[in-house]
Amino acid sequence: MKVSACGCGKRYKQFHFGDYLGDGLFATLARIMQILSLFTEILIYAVPAVLAITLHEAAHGYAAKRLGDNTAWVLGRVTLNPVKHIDPVGTLLVPGLLLVGGMMPGGSALLFGWAKPVPVNFGRLYNPKRDMIWVALAGPLMNLAQVVAWLIVLKLIILISPESVLGSVAVDVAFAGLSVNMMLAAFNLIPILPLDGGRILEGLLPWKWAVPYSNLERYGMMIIVVLLVSGLLNYFISPFMHVLKVLVQWVAVF
């Protein structure tokens, strides 16, 4: 863009279409690259995230059935069909927004979500207070088991072909599986109802404390949102992610 003067002394701006086209084309290409990058990231995380959430919820239902309550089994929730467990907000919207936000400058790497809770009738368990601990613990333990499985997958990729295009994509998928499962396990172990950690704490507390504690469940999601927005949630999840980092480094070396 140049600035010229006319004979009457007035100045005007002279636009050069080539300059404008160049700037506009660059901006358009940059936007397309951002969209492609986001789409690729979603594809990489899709399978590990669906597996993480599906197996987590199925584990709750299976544990409940083994301990006396077949409610989830009868309702078809003890299944590897992800459609049965998907929650539109917790499984799709929230993780999607966090993923997009994490790609922005200064965005957080925190990624979590939730599925439709598996129905459990604690009164039908053989020992309700004790068994609710095992039912709640089954979900996070399943995620930690998947962390181990993805570590094995990562090691196999490193041994076979880490530098090929397919190997590079497989490494990204493995890292996605590791991070999603560790974050999901850590998030669910937060001792706030209705999360699994809250249910575990409820089972461990004496009755005189467990009852008033269970009454706080109605405020649970509000408390979790406050922790998320304030950044305090990171203090609970960070130690888990540090352990994961150490495990990945160990797998890479040995």
Report the location of each language-model feature.
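Hydrophobic transmembrane alpha-helices and their immediate loop junctions
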Residues: 6-8, 15-254
